[in-house]
Amino acid sequence: GITTAVWAGIMENPIKEAIMKGAAFAKENECDFIIALGGGAVLDSSIAIAAMATNEGDLWDYVCGGTGKGKPLAQKGLPIVTIATTAGTGSEINCWGVISNLETKEKIGFGNPTLTPVLAIVDPELMLTVPAKYTAYQGFDALFHHTEVMMSNGVNVLSETIALSAIANIAKYLPRAVANGNDLEAREHIAYGSTMAGITMQLTSTTAQHSMEHA
C-alpha cells in the first residue's frame, strides 16, 4: 500500500509562511509526491510547496517579481496530482500559484514549467455542494480568464479556439449551475470552462487586469 500524510494548513489567499510549513511537512514525511485536493488556494499552494520541498532556502529566493531574488530552482519539485473541488481558477493544470508575503506586503505569482501537475482530476460531482454565490464568483473568474486571453497581445489560433468554446459554455451553463447546484450537466460544462482556462493562460497570457484583481 501507499503511506499517506495529510497536511491541512492552507487558507484563502495563501501566505509564504504556510507554504514553508507545508514544504517542511513534506520533507519530514519524506513525501514522494503531492495530492492537492481543494480549490484555487490549495492548488496554487501545491505548486510552491512542491518546489520548496526539494529546494533549500526561502520561497522568495525563487520568486522573480517584487523583492524576490529570482534564483532558478536547483532541483525539480515533487510531482503534483490535483483534484479540483471548485470551477474557477484553472490552477489544476497550470504551473503557477499566487502567494502573499506579509512581511514585504506583496502578492506575486510563482511558478515554473517543471511544476505543472502530472495529473488533474476534474470531477463535477465534487463541485455539487459549492454554494450558489461562490459558484457565480468562480464561474466569472473562469470567464474573465478567457476574455483576458482574447484581449492579450499573445493570443493565437489555438488559445482563441479554446477560449471561445469555454466562453460559450460558461455563458450558457453558469446561470443553470447558480440556479441549481445539483445540475450535474451545468457543473460539468463550467468545470470544462475553468480547466480550459488553465490551458489558454499557459498558451497566451493574461492582461494587466489580472494583476489588479489579485491586488
Task: State the predicted function of each range.
Residues 1:
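Small-residue-rich anion-binding loops in enzyme active sites
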Residues 96-204:
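Carboxylate- and glycine-rich phosphate/diphosphate-binding segment that chelates Mg2+/Mn2+
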Residues 5-8, 34-37, 198-200:
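Short glycine-rich or small-residue beta-strand-to-loop segments that form or flank ligand, phosphate
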Residues 19-122:
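Glycine/threonine-rich beta-strand-loop-alpha-helix active-site module
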Residues 10-11, 37-39, 204-209:
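Active-site nucleophile and cofactor-binding loops and adjacent substrate-binding regions
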Residues 6-16:
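Short beta->alpha junction loops
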Residues 214-215:
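Catalytic phosphate/nucleotide-handling subdomain of diverse soluble enzymes
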